[in-house]
C-alpha cells in the first residue's frame, strides 16, 4: 500500500512510523525541523506545502491513502479536496481514500464522520475522540481505561490492582463477575498474560475486562470502591477538548462537575452553554483555589489544558492535595511515560484516536474498530466475519489466532 501523509507533527509522525514497516509512505511538511525528524523513518520526505496541487500531483499516482493531519483544519480539508480533483482529471489513477484531521466544532460534531461530497472521505476529530474516551473512563471511577465496541453493545474496561486491594493473592476463578463479563488480558510489568482460572492476581496488575455494558455496572464493587454519592469531577481547562468533555459530563445525572478556566471570557461562554456545571475563573495551579474547592473530596481531577507542562503541574498538585484519581492530557508522546512515572493515574493522548482510525483502514476488510491500550503495548480489534470467512461455523477454540492473541 502507498500512503501520503501531510503534516509531520505528532500525529503525522506516528502514523508514518506505524505504516512504514510494510508500506510505501510519503510525508510532506513545510517545517524544516518536522521534516528532518520524519527523515529518521523509512519514508520519502518532501519539504513543502501539502495542499499544493503541483506537489500532490507528483506523489498521488498509485496512492491508496492520503492523510492530512497538519494543525490547520482548512489546510487539511483543502489538501483532500485538491487530491480528489487531481485524481478526477487523471485517467487510470485509482481513487485515493482521503482523511482529514479536523478540530473546529463548526466542521464536525462527532469523533469520526464523512464529508465525501466535498472530497473528504473521513474526518477525524482527535479532540472529540479524546473527550469521548475520558467520558467513558469517568463512568467507572476506578477504571484507568475504557472503550466501547459493537456500536455500544460491548464495553472494555481496564482496572489497576493496588497493593492494598482485597483481590491480591486470589485466583482468577474467585472473581465474582457477571456471566457476560470475562478478564481477557492481564498486563504485569513487561508481560501480557492471557489469564486462566488458576492464575493468581498480583499487586500492580492491570486487568482488562470485556462484557455487556449493563453487566459491568457492579465492577466498581469488585475492583474498586462503590461510590455512594454523585461522582465529583474537577475539570481544569475548557478549550476544545475541555468543552467537548464538559458537554458530555453535563448530561450525566450522577456527575457533579466543576470547571477551572483561566480565561474570563471563555468562562462566561462556557457557563451559558452548560446547565449543571459550576464554572470558576482561575488557574489550575493555584493551590489556594484548589483547597477552596475541597480538591481532597474530588473523585476525579481531569487536566486538559493545551499545555502538557501545565497539565503535568496541575495533576501533581491535585495528587499532592489529596485528589483520589487524576487524568491528564499529554499531546507529546514522549511525555506519556513521564506522566505515569510521577504518579499520574492516567495520561491520555489525542493523537491515538487518529492513528487508530488510519491503521484500521490499512488492515483490510472486516475491521470495525481498532484501539490501542497500555501505551500501544497491545491492540484491540473488532472484526466482522463475512459469510465467506474461513472462521464462520468454527468453535473459537479451533480458530488459529495469531500468536499472542487470546
UniProtKB/Swiss-Prot annotation:
<keyword id="KW-0406">Ion transport</keyword>
<dbReference type="InterPro" id="IPR036291">
    <property type="entry name" value="NAD(P)-bd_dom_sf"/>
</dbReference>
<feature type="domain" description="RCK N-terminal 2">
    <location>
        <begin position="230"/>
        <end position="348"/>
    </location>
</feature>
<feature type="binding site" description="in other chain">
    <location>
        <begin position="70"/>
        <end position="71"/>
    </location>
    <ligand>
        <name>NAD(+) 1</name>
    </ligand>
</feature>
<keyword id="KW-0813">Transport</keyword>
<keyword id="KW-0520">NAD</keyword>
<comment type="function">
    <text>Part of a potassium transport system.</text>
</comment>
<keyword id="KW-0630">Potassium</keyword>
<feature type="domain" description="RCK N-terminal 1">
    <location>
        <begin position="1"/>
        <end position="124"/>
    </location>
</feature>
<feature type="binding site" description="in other chain">
    <location>
        <begin position="7"/>
        <end position="11"/>
    </location>
    <ligand>
        <name>NAD(+) 1</name>
    </ligand>
</feature>
<dbReference type="GO" id="GO:0005886">
    <property type="term" value="C:plasma membrane"/>
</dbReference>
<dbReference type="InterPro" id="IPR036721">
    <property type="entry name" value="RCK_C_sf"/>
</dbReference>
<dbReference type="InterPro" id="IPR006036">
    <property type="entry name" value="K_uptake_TrkA"/>
</dbReference>
<feature type="binding site">
    <location>
        <begin position="232"/>
        <end position="262"/>
    </location>
    <ligand>
        <name>NAD(+) 2</name>
    </ligand>
</feature>
<feature type="domain" description="RCK C-terminal">
    <location>
        <begin position="144"/>
        <end position="225"/>
    </location>
</feature>
<protein>
    <recommendedName>
        <fullName>Trk system potassium uptake protein trkA homolog 1</fullName>
    </recommendedName>
</protein>
<keyword id="KW-0677">Repeat</keyword>
<dbReference type="GO" id="GO:0015079">
    <property type="term" value="F:potassium ion transmembrane transporter activity"/>
</dbReference>
<dbReference type="InterPro" id="IPR006037">
    <property type="entry name" value="RCK_C"/>
</dbReference>
<keyword id="KW-0633">Potassium transport</keyword>
<dbReference type="InterPro" id="IPR050721">
    <property type="entry name" value="Trk_Ktr_HKT_K-transport"/>
</dbReference>
<feature type="binding site" description="in other chain">
    <location>
        <position position="29"/>
    </location>
    <ligand>
        <name>NAD(+) 1</name>
    </ligand>
</feature>
<dbReference type="Pfam" id="PF02254">
    <property type="entry name" value="TrkA_N"/>
</dbReference>
<dbReference type="InterPro" id="IPR003148">
    <property type="entry name" value="RCK_N"/>
</dbReference>
<dbReference type="Pfam" id="PF02080">
    <property type="entry name" value="TrkA_C"/>
</dbReference>
<feature type="binding site">
    <location>
        <position position="101"/>
    </location>
    <ligand>
        <name>NAD(+) 1</name>
    </ligand>
</feature>
Amino acid at each position: 500500500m502507498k500512503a501520503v501523509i501531510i503534516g509531520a507533527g505528532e500525529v503525522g509522525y506516528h502514523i508514518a512510523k506505524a505504516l512504514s514497516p510494510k508500506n510505501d509512505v510519503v510525508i510532506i511538511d513545510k517545517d524544516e525541523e518536522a521534516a528532518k525528524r520524519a527523515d529518521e523513518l523509512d519514508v520519502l520526505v518532501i519539504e513543502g506545502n501539502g495542499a499544493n496541487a503541483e506537489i500532490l500531483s507528483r506523489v498521488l499516482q498509485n496512492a491508496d491513502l492520503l492523510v492530512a493531519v497538519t494543525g490547520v483544519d482548512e489546510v487539511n480539508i483543502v489538501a483532500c479536496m485538491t487530491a480528489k480533483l487531481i485524481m478526477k482529471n487523471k485517467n487510470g489513477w485509482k481513487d485515493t481514500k482521503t482523511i482529514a484531521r479536523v478540530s473546529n466544532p463548526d466542521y464536525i460534531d462527532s469523533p469520526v464522520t464523512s464529508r465525501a461530497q466535498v472530497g473528504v472521505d473521513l474526518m477525524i476529530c482527535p479532540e472529540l475522540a479524546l473527550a469521548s474516551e475520558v467520558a467513558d473512563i469517568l463512568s467507572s471511577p476506578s477504571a484507568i481505561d475504557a472503550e466501547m465496541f459493537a456500536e455500544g453493545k460491548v464495553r472494555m474496561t481496564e482496572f489497576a490492582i493496588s497493593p492494598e486491594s482485597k483481590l491480591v493473592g486470589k485466583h482468577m476463578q474467585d472473581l465474582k463477575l457477571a456471566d457476560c463479563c470475562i478478564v481477557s488480558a492481564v498486563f504485569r510489568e513487561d508481560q501480557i498474560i492471557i489469564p486462566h482460572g488458576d492464575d493468581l492476581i498480583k499487586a500492580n496488575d492491570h486487568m482488562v475486562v470485556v462484557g455487556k455494558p449493563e453487566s459491568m455496572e457492579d465492577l466498581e464493587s469488585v475492583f474498586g470502591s462503590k461510590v455512594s454519592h454523585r461522582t465529583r469531577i474537577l475539570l481544569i481547562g475548557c478549550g476544545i477538548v475541555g468543552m467537548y468533555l464538559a458537554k458530555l459530563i453535563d448530561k450525566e445525572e450522577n456527575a457533579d462537575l466543576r470547571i477551572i478556566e483561566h480565561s474570563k471570557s471563555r468562562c462566561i461562554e462556557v457557563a451559558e452553554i452548560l446547565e449543571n456545571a459550576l464554572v470558576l475563573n482561575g488557574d489550575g495551579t493555584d493551590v489556594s483555589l484548589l483547597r477552596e474547592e475541597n480538591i481532597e473530596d474530588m473523585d476525579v481531577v481531569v487536566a486538559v489544558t493545551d499545555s502538557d507542562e501545565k497539565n503535568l503541574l496541575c495533576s501533581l498538585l491535585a495528587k499532592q492535595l489529596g485528589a483520589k484519581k487524576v487524568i491528564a492530557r499529554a499531546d507529546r508522546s514522549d511525555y506519556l511515560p513521564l506522566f505515569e512515572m510521577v504518579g499520574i493515574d492516567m495520561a491520555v493522548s489525542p493523537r491515538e484516536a487518529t492513528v487508530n482510525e488510519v491503521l484500521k483502514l490499512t488492515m483490510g476488510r472486516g475491521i470495525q474498530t481498532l484501539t490501542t491500550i497500555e501505551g500501544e503495548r497491545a491492540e484491540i480489534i473488532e472484526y466482522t466475519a463475512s459469510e465467506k470467512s474461513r472462521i464462520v461455523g468454527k468453535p473459537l477454540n479451533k480458530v488459529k489466532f495469531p500468536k499472542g492473541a487470546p
